[in-house]
Amino acid sequence: MSAEILNPNLRRVVLASNNAGKLREFSALFAPLGIELVPQSELGVSEAEEPHATFVENALAKARHASRHTGLPALADDSGLCVVALGGAPGVHSARYAQQPGGARSDAANNALLVRELAAAGDRRAWYVALLALVRTENDPCPLIGEGLWHGEIVDAPAGEHGFGYDPHFYLPQQGCTAAQLAPEHKNRISHRAQALAQLLDKLRATGPVDRP
């Protein structure tokens, strides 16, 4: 099957993230579209600040930062876990939930804190959120936004070797396993990021030319 090639200006896009797990997932999702994702670290771009209270504002800030420093179109993801019993926390703070001032981020520490916080909670419902923002230029007046939600439950015991972040504790009742137990190719079809990407690409096709070789 021929790859679907989007607007030639989008053949090379900087990914506004230094997260290796996100790079793997997004590279796999974008490869069939003929789009090369280049991590911002390879282009000497530092991480942007994430001062905002919403996923969409943080995603836009990161995308504009990467585009400003590279002159390339930029894709940013701001995603996180929202837990009903915690009032939507950790939310936009998911990646640094257990981070101490001046300390490093750690998936293990984040997961341990999450389990402790839910020790007495009967309601384990949670959902992953993914917000994707694609800007063609730093000052793109019409950035493309895609949103995806993935519902599940938090379990105490981790299971699975795939994925990253909270995946070992994110149980999917319909699949009967955690997100970390899904094969990567399966996860990439149903995850919050896959849903957000599908929405973003629908908008991209509606606003720009699509060439099919």
Swiss-Prot record:
Q: What is its EC number?
A: 3.6.1.66
Name the InterPro entries on file: dITP/XTP_pyrophosphatase (IPR020922), ITPase-like_fam (IPR029001), RdgB/HAM1 (IPR002637)
Record's Gene Ontology CC terms? Answer: cytosol
Q: Do you know which Pfam families this protein is assigned to?
A: Ham1p_like
Q: Does the keyword Hydrolase apply?
A: yes
Binding positions (Mg(2+)): 49, 78
> Which reaction is catalysed here?
XTP + H2O = XMP + diphosphate + H(+); dITP + H2O = dIMP + diphosphate + H(+); ITP + H2O = IMP + diphosphate + H(+)
Enzyme class (EC, first level): hydrolase
Q: How is the cofactor bound?
A: Binds 1 Mg(2+) ion per subunit.
Which of UniProt's keywords are assigned here?
Hydrolase, Magnesium, Metal-binding, Nucleotide metabolism, Nucleotide-binding
For this UniProt entry, the molecular function terms from Gene Ontology, in alphabetical order, are: dITP diphosphatase activity; ITP diphosphatase activity; metal ion binding; nucleotide binding; ribonucleoside triphosphate phosphatase activity; XTP diphosphatase activity
Subunit text = Homodimer.
Q: Which family does it belong to?
A: Belongs to the HAM1 NTPase family.
Purpose: Pyrophosphatase that catalyzes the hydrolysis of nucleoside triphosphates to their monophosphate derivatives, with a high preference for the non-canonical purine nucleotides XTP (xanthosine triphosphate), dITP (deoxyinosine triphosphate) and ITP. Seems to function as a house-cleaning enzyme that removes non-canonical purine nucleotides from the nucleotide pool, thus preventing their incorporation into DNA/RNA and avoiding chromosomal lesions.
The protein, known as: dITP/XTP pyrophosphatase
